[in-house]
Amino acid sequence: MKKIRTGMTLAAAVALAVGMNPFGSLPGSRVCAEDGTTAAKEVTLRVCNWEEYIDLGDWDEEETIDLESGDIIGENSMVEDFEQWYYETYGVKVKVEYSTFGTNEDLYNMLTLGDVYDIVCPSEYMIMKLMAEDKLVPLSEHFFDTSDENNYYSKGVSPYIRNIFEKNEINGEAWSKYAAGYMWGLTGIVYNPEEVSEEDASSWKILDNPDYKRQVTIKDNVRDSYFAAVGALKSDLLTSESFRNDPDYKQKLVDEMNDTSPETIQAVQDYLQDVKNNAYSFETDSGKADMITGKVLANYQWSGDAVYTMDQAEEDGVFLDYAVPEESTNIYFDGWVMLKSVIGEDKDKQKAAEAFINFNSRPDNAIRNMYYIGYTSVISGGDDPRVFEYADWNYGAEDGEEDTVDYDLAYFFTEDGNSEDYVITAPAEQARRQLYAQYPDADAMDRSSIMIYFDEKQ
C-alpha cells in the first residue's frame, strides 16, 4: 500500500499565500511582447482555498505515481500548471492570485470585511449560506456541456456526488447550479483497536462513554458537535430495524439528524455538557497529533484527516482503525463557487474561474491533489480509468497476499452502482482503515446524511 503525501515546503506555502509564483516565471506569462505592446489580454483570477488543500508540486522522482495508464508526478504547482494550460488552450494569459483560509467562518468574515475573490472553496453548509444570501454567480450552461473535451468536471464527477448536488436545494435551486464539488468525505471515529472495541467506536455514544474518560476528543464547532450529539441521543431510534427498513429511510434520517426543535436543542446542550466532563478536549486540529502520540484513544475526525492520522501513526508502528457510527454519519463536501460581487457580468473572469475548476477536475490533476493533501476528490473520471487505478495503486493487495477482501466501489464510479469493474482486492485490514476512510463502503454511505444550513432563526 502506497503512502499519502502530506505537508508542503514553507517557502512554497508563503509564496502561494501572497500570490507569488513559487517556482519562477511561466512560459508565456509575460504581458508585453518584444516590441513593447501587449502580447495578449491577461485575466487576473483571485482564488481562495483551504490551507494546504492543493498540490504545490516539487515532488521527488520516487513519488511518481506509476499507473497502468501512465505516470503522474507533480513537478510544478497546480496553480502554475493551470496558468500555462490556460494560455496554451485559450490563448489568453491568466494570473492566479492564490490565498488561503483556515475555517469557513474565517472565509465568511474575510468576504464580509471586503476581501475580494473571484472563486472560493467553502464547505457545503457555507455554500448553502452564500446561496441563501444571493452572493453567488451560477455556473454557465457551457460548463455542463460534456461534448467539450475541456469540461472535465461535468464529464468526470462521480455519479453519486452529482446526484447529491442535483437533489439538494436552497430556495428551490439545486446546489449544482452554483457549486462544483472538490473534495468530500464522511465524519467518523479514529481509534486504537488495542484499547477500544470496534463496537464502541461505531457509535457516537463513545463520546460520553465513561470507559474512555479523558481518552476521546470531539470537534470544537457547533455543527459537528451538534450532529454527533443528535446521533448519540437518538441512537436507539436510528439503529432500530423498523427505522432502517422504512421506505422513506433516507429522508427520515435527514429529518432526524437535522432536528432543531427546542426539546432537541436542550437535550443536545445537556448531552454536550456530559461530553465536556468526559472528553479529553474539544478540538479543531490537535486531535490528529493526540491520536498519533497516544494521548487519546479515540478521535472524532473528518475522513481525510483520519487517513493522515492513520498514516502518521503507522510510521511509528501504531496501527489505528476508522469507524463510521452506526446511527448516522455526516457526508461533507468542499466545493468551488464564484462570487457575484467580484465576477458579476465579467465573462472573461467567469471563463477562467470555470476553467480552474475543470483543470483541477482533470483526472491526473485530481489524483495529484488527492496524493498531496490526503482527501478524496469528487472526481471518478468518467471514461478515464486513472482515478480508480489510483485507488487500487494505493490500497490494492500485493501479489500473493492471502488475507484479502473484495472492496466494491461501484456506487462511486458508476451510474447504477452495479459493476464488477470497480472492485479492489485489498488487504482485509483496509476494510476498516485508510481505504474505508477514503472510500467508505455502500453500507456506510447508506446511513450518511447531509447537515442542512440553519438560518439565523434556527
Tell where the protein language model's regions lie, with residue ranges.
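Periplasmic-binding protein-like
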Residues: 145-152, 266-273, 317-340
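Conserved C-terminal helix/tail region of periplasmic/extracytoplasmic solute-binding proteins
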Residues: 410-458
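Sec-dependent signal peptide cleavage junction
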Residues: 20-38
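Ligand-binding pocket segment of bilobal, Venus flytrap-like solute-binding proteins
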Residues: 218, 225-229, 238-321
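Short loop->beta-strand "edge-of-pocket" segments that line small-molecule binding or catalytic clefts
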Residues: 206-222
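Hinge/lid segment of periplasmic solute-binding proteins
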Residues: 35-39, 93, 97-108, 128-184, ...
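Early extracytoplasmic/lumenal segment of secretory-pathway proteins
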Residues: 35-133
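Mature extracytoplasmic/periplasmic domains
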Residues: 338-426
